[in-house]
Every structure is written in structure tokens, then in C-alpha cells.
């Protein structure tokens, strides 16, 4: 009955910019926050990333190429589990409908 937010970051500049946001991932319905980043990005900037993510979790993604040259990501694993926020507000039925609608709008408008 809660949301889990996953922020996808593909480079260190995008990752750093996330911490300059005025409202840093503090929506009341979000119980856990994860960053999903390429494994090689993490290995290159491990100390900085570990220091900044605080209670957020970390999902590492490996970049793979298939036989046709198509690049895709494969989850390497949960490097760190997110600490649940104690003040998170459970979703109401209206909230669930709202988020489902938002998700559908993102696909329909492509």
C-alpha cells in the first residue's frame, strides 16, 4: 500500500544533479527510494555514491549487448536495500487510481 520510487541515473552528473532538487524525493506516499545505476558508474564513483545515498537503496545494472548489437540493461542485483520511511502515508484507493492513470498516460502519449 505504499510507493517505491526508483530513480534511474546513467551518469555521475545526472546523479549529482538529483541532490540539488528543491524537493528531494519526499513525496508522502513513497516508502522506499532506490537509485538504479550502471555497475561501472558505481565502481568508478563508489565512495561519493555511498556517501550521498543515505537511506536510499542501490540497484546495480549491467549493460549487455545481444548478437544483433542491441544494448540493454540487466539487473545485477540490489547492492543496498532501502531503509523504509517511517512517516510514509499508505495509498488510498483514489491514490492508486491516480498513479495508474499517470503510468498509462506516459505510455499513451509516446
Question: What positions do the PLM features span?
Answer:
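Active-site beta-strand-loop-beta-strand hairpin of nuclease catalytic cores
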Residues: 1-5
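Anionic group-transfer/hydrolysis microenvironments
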Residues: 7-9
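Non-catalytic C-terminal interaction segments of nucleic acid-processing enzymes
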Residues: 47-110
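Short, charged, amphipathic alpha-helix that recurs within catalytic cores of restriction-modification
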Residues: 11-52
Amino acid at each position: 500500500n505504499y510507493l517505491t520510487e526508483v530513480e534511474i541515473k546513467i551518469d555521475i552528473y545526472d546523479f549529482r544533479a538529483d541532490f540539488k532538487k528543491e524537493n528531494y524525493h519526499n513525496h508522502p506516499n513513497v516508502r522506499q527510494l532506490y537509485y538504479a545505476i550502471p555497475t561501472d558508474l558505481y565502481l568508478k564513483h563508489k565512495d561519493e555514491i555511498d556517501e550521498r545515498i543515505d537511506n536510499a537503496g542501490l540497484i546495480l545494472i549491467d549493460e549487455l549487448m545481444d548478437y544483433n548489437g542491441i544494448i540493454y540493461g540487466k539487473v545485477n542485483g540490489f547492492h543496498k536495500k532501502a531503509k523504509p520511511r517511517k512517516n510514509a502515508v499508505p495509498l488510498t484507493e483514489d491514490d492508486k487510481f491516480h498513479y495508474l492513470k499517470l503510468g498509462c498516460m506516459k505510455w499513451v502519449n509516446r
